[in-house]
């Protein structure tokens, strides 16, 4: 794995790089122009192309880089399927305090904050020509391309490390999805086609790891779409699970089951239904009837317990799977993260309201 860390000024990129080195045996790799190369005992190269070639030859090893400044560099690294771009950020006041500490400055000069904000914004938004005439890429553009975003408001390294452990950064699923992740992502893609104005649900029916059919929720064909006013129940804002009998929309699971047909699901092989939302009781009955052997879902729904009881009685395995690529940093150690943010906002309030 080759991890590229990008982020705002004093967000903690190098601290996270050190965590990867110490906890996961990564090697710091960078350009010879990186001023912190010696500090990390880094492998240094004269160009991004040389780094790309080296990591390609040694792709089974783990490397981390924090020095990505041009679009050309980033594009070279992103061509490789073992590269993961991670964006790091922290609240402004947190980064300012770190900046003061790094430069051994006292927080008693109002001009210091202005200097920091100017320096931070220059890194975040400013494009300029570098020494090799390649256009630099601002941090905000790099962050848009990141596969993972990390918020780092922590006061000490120990808490940050706990949070990073909970994020499971080095999970191979982030580079090449498992079958569960692959099909769940397909169900999320199918959900984008939903025309129900209440909820986006997508479903994938699979047998022996081969897609049989797909489905999403919305009105039957030749009828006005729900999001065009076609379903009175949905458009009147009925609560979850209420008046489902008057809903004119087909559920994603129903669409997928109708498309597949019972004959394609029965017989040798293992039929699995992937849905980004746990099936309702009405869909659960149909799933049992057609012979699906396993149901995998990502998001909970209001009827989960009743659905689970029916599947258990029918001998159908029900389990939850949320791909790491669909998880945000808040789904790591959320309590630890929330406490750190609360502490810093309290410090900010005390600072400006003495």
Regions found by a protein language model. Name each.
Residues 1-5, 58-66, 271:
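Generic beta-sheet signal
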Residues 2-11, 15-33, 42-44, 93, ...:
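Zinc-dependent deaminase catalytic domain
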Residues 4, 48-54, 68, 73-83, ...:
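Nucleotidyltransferase catalytic core that binds NTPs
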Residues 19, 23-69, 73:
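ATP-dependent small-molecule kinase phosphotransfer cores
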Residues 54-106:
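ATP-dependent NMP and nucleoside kinases share a basic, alpha-helical "lid"
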Residues 60-61, 81-82, 143-147, 153, ...:
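Short, well-ordered alpha-helix to beta-strand connector turns
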Residues 71-74, 94-164:
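Small-molecule kinase domains that catalyze NTP-dependent phosphoryl transfer to phosphate-bearing small molecules
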Residues 76-77, 140-142, 286, 310:
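Hydrophobic/aromatic ligand-binding patch that stacks against planar heteroaromatic rings
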């Amino acid at each position: 794995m080759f991890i590229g860390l990008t982020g705002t000024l004093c967000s903690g990129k190098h601290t996270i790089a050190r965590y990867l080195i110490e906890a996961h045996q990564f090697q710091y790799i960078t350009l010879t122009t990186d001023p912190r190369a010696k500090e990390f005992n880094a492998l240094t190269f004269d160009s991004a192309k040389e780094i790309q070639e080296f990591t390609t030859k040694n792709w089974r090893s783990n490397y981390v880089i924090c020095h990505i400044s041009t679009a050309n560099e980033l594009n070279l690294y992103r061509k490789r399927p073992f590269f993961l771009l991670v964006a790091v950020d922290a609240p402004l006041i947190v980064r300012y305090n770190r900046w003061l500490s790094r430069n051994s400055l006292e927080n008693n000069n109002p001009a210091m904050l202005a200097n920091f904000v100017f320096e931070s914004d220059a890194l975040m938004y400013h494009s300029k020509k570098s020494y090799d005439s390649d256009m630099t890429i601002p941090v905000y553009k790099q962050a848009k391309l990141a596969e993972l975003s990390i918020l780092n408001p922590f006061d000490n390294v120990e808490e940050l490390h706990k949070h990073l452990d909970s994020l499971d950064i080095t999970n191979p699923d982030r580079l090449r999805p498992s079958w569960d992740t692959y099909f769940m992502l397909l169900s999320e893609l199918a959900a984008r086609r939903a025309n129900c104005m209440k909820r986006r649900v997508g479903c994938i029916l699979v047998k022996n790891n081969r897609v049989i059919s797909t489905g999403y929720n919305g009105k039957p064909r030749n009828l006005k779409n729900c999001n065009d006013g076609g379903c009175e129940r949905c458009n009147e804002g009925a609560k979850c699970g209420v008046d489902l009998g008057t809903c004119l929309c087909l559920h994603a699971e129903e669409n997928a089951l109708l498309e597949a047909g019972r004959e394609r699901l029965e017989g040798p092989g293992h039929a699995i239904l992937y849905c980004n939302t746990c099936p309702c009781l009405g869909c659960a009955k149909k799933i049992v009837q057609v012979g699906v052997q396993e149901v995998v879902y990502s998001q909970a729904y209001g009827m989960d317990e009743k659905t689970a009881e029916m599947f258990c009685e029918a001998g159908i395995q029900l389990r939850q799977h949320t791909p790491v690529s669909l998880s945000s940093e808040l789904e790591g150690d959320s309590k630890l993260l929330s406490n750190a943010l609360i502490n810093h906002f309290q410090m900010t309030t005390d600072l400006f309201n003495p």
